[in-house]
Amino acid sequence: MYKRQGFGYKISAVPFHFWTPDVYEGSPTAITAYLSVAPKAAGFALILRFFNQIFSEMPNGLSDPWISVNNLPWPQLIAILSAATMTLGNLVAIQQSSVKRMLAYSSIAHAGYMMMALPLMSTSSIEGIMMYLTMYLFMNLGAFFVVIYIKDVIGGESFDDFNGLGWKMPHIGMSMTLFMVALTGLPPTAGFVGKFYIFAAVIEAGSNFYCCLLYTSPSPRDCKT
């Protein structure tokens, strides 16, 4: 049980996410950029390795190896936590006035999307998580690089400091827009490709429970409108 709590803390999953917004906002932006991708990538790699090792030691022919993990309905529990993580991250992100806090809650929401494929533990779900992590790394680091540049030039990190960015610095404004659209998951960006692989793995599993979770999940609104 403690291992699962540690995993949740590592990837900023609800209800172990409370440290994320304050750490993101209080740390230097360069450090925040590192924290936004490195722990999450390491956390998901560790989770996949952990459960894969457990399942490889299960007796052959076991219909549902998850049942042997503390006799708890882990697929359903992880799916519920995934839905809670997606919902809270997306809804709270659009209420922030600080770009760094917005990206913090965006990071929480993205963890929820990747958690959606964890209970499946199929080849396609693992590939989907790895693909999503790779796309997320480039999208998130790009957004933070823009924040670092604006901080150096203007001296602020709030949304007010980004007002009129398209007129003042067209190239920077276009770059930030592209990264935000990608984080939202709109086609034809890399964010859409990452979410496509995750959703495809869920649909391929054919479980009514996970398909219901997929269709009722909130829209990925990771940028403030």
Listing of model-derived features with the role each one plays in the protein:
Residues 1-5, 215-220:
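Conserved small/polar residues in nucleotide/adenosyl-binding loops
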Residues 3-4, 33, 92-158:
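Alpha-helical multi-pass transmembrane bundles of energy-transducing inner-membrane proteins
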Residues 7-77, 104:
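Short helix-boundary/re-entrant hairpin motifs in multi-pass inner-membrane proteins
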